[in-house]
Amino acid sequence: MQVSDFHFDLPDELIARYPQPERTASRLLQMDGNTGELIDGTFSDVLEQVQAGDLVVFNNTRVIPARLFGRKESGGKLEVLVERMLNEKSILAHVRCSKSPKPGTTILVGENDEYSAQMVARHDALFELKFNSDKTVLEILEEIGHMPLPPYIDRPDEDADKERYQTVYNQKPGAVAAPTAGLHFDDVLLEKITAKGAEFAYVTLHVGAGTFQPVKVDDIDDHHMHAEYVEVPQDVVDAINATKARGGRVVAVGTTSVRSLESAAQDALKKGTELVPFFGDTEIFIYPGYEYQLVDCLITNFHLPESTLIMLVSAFAGYENTMNAYKHAVENKYRFFSYGDSMFIKKKTA
C-alpha cells in the first residue's frame, strides 16, 4: 500500500488546540470493525462498552517537561527537545539552532543560564548532552523545562498543560509526548469501570518525539519505525492469560498500549514461547496485513493523515472502515489529535 492511501483532508479548525473543560466531556465515535457500523456518543459511553471480565490496559508513562530553551556559550539561541533520558546526567535530544553544535560545545539552558551541558556526541539527527550539575536530568527538567506540546498545537505551553497533557494514572517519567487516549479518563470513570467488574493492567511505553515525524517513503513497506522503550511486566502477562482463559477481552487504551502488548506477543512468537515479560526497545510497525495477537478492542484518538497510527488503526478495524470513520468524523466536526476526541473500536475478525 502507498502512504497516500491514508490521506484525508482535515480542516484546520478541527485540530484541537485545548482540551475540553472536563476529561470525559470529549466525544466518542464507536465502531464495529466487522460491520463498519458507527455510533456517535460521548466518552462516558466507554462505561457501556467495557464489560465485566474485560482487561483494560493503560500506558502509565509520565510526560516529562522535555523542552528547554537556551543558548550556546558563544551566544546563539537554541531549543532542546529531549528524546530520551540516558541516565541521571545525560540525555539524547533534538537540538534546534542556526548552526548545529559540535562535540565539545557547551550550552546554557534556562531563562538565566541556570544550567550548563556539554555536547558529547552526535547520533544521526540526535545529540548526546551531559549536564554539569549535582541535580539529575529529571530534577532540572521539572524545574525549568516546558511541556512538549505537539507541533500541531500551535501555541506556547501553559500552566494548565502540566496537568491536562498528562494522564491521571501516570507513574513512570520518560515520555516526551502523551499517550493521548488516556487523557479522557478521570478518577471517577476509572472507579465506575472497576465497579462494573473489569480489571486494569499497566504497561509502559515512553513515547518519543519520533511519533510526530512524517512517513518519508511512498510505499509503507519501506518505512522503518523509530525505537521506543517498552515494559510489559509479569503481572500484565498473568492478567492477559487469565482474561483470555475466562473469555474476556483485552481493551487497549491507546496505540502505545497496543504497540507494547503486540511487541511482547511478537517477541514470544519469534522465540517460540508462551507470552513472557518484555523489557526493551520496540520498532514494531503495525499496518494492514498485520495479525493482532492480543488486543480485542482499542480506544484511540483521531490521528494525522498518512501517519503510522492511522495505519495501525486500519490494521485493527479494516482499511475501508477506518477511512470511512475518519470521513464521518470530519463531516460531523469531531476534534482531532492529542487534545481531541476519540474512538472505541471492536477488532475486525472476519
Swiss-Prot record:
- Where can this protein be found? Cytoplasm
> Its Enzyme Commission number?
2.4.99.17
Q: Which pathway does it serve? A: tRNA modification; tRNA-queuosine biosynthesis
Q: List the disulfide bonds.
A: none
Keywords (alphabetical) are:
Cytoplasm, Queuosine biosynthesis, S-adenosyl-L-methionine, Transferase
GO terms assigned for molecular function:
S-adenosylmethionine:tRNA ribosyltransferase-isomerase activity
Please indicate if the UniProt record lists Plastid as a keyword. Answer: no
Reactions this protein catalyses:
7-aminomethyl-7-carbaguanosine(34) in tRNA + S-adenosyl-L-methionine = epoxyqueuosine(34) in tRNA + adenine + L-methionine + 2 H(+)
Q: Which GO terms describe its cellular component?
A: cytoplasm
First-listed, main subcellular location of the protein, grouped into a coarse class: cytoplasm
- Pfam families per the UniProt record, alphabetical: Queuosine_synth
State the Gene Ontology BP annotations: queuosine biosynthetic process; tRNA wobble guanine modification
Annotated NCBIfam families? PRK00147.1, queA
Protein task? Transfers and isomerizes the ribose moiety from AdoMet to the 7-aminomethyl group of 7-deazaguanine (preQ1-tRNA) to give epoxyqueuosine (oQ-tRNA).
On subunit structure and binding partners, the annotation says:
Monomer.
Q: Which PANTHER family match?
A: S-ADENOSYLMETHIONINE:TRNA RIBOSYLTRANSFERASE-ISOMERASE (PTHR30307:SF0)
The family note in this entry says: Belongs to the QueA family.
Question: What name does UniProt use for this protein?
Answer: S-adenosylmethionine:tRNA ribosyltransferase-isomerase
Q: What high-level taxonomic lineage is stated for the organism?
A: Bacteria, Pseudomonadati, Pseudomonadota, Gammaproteobacteria, Vibrionales
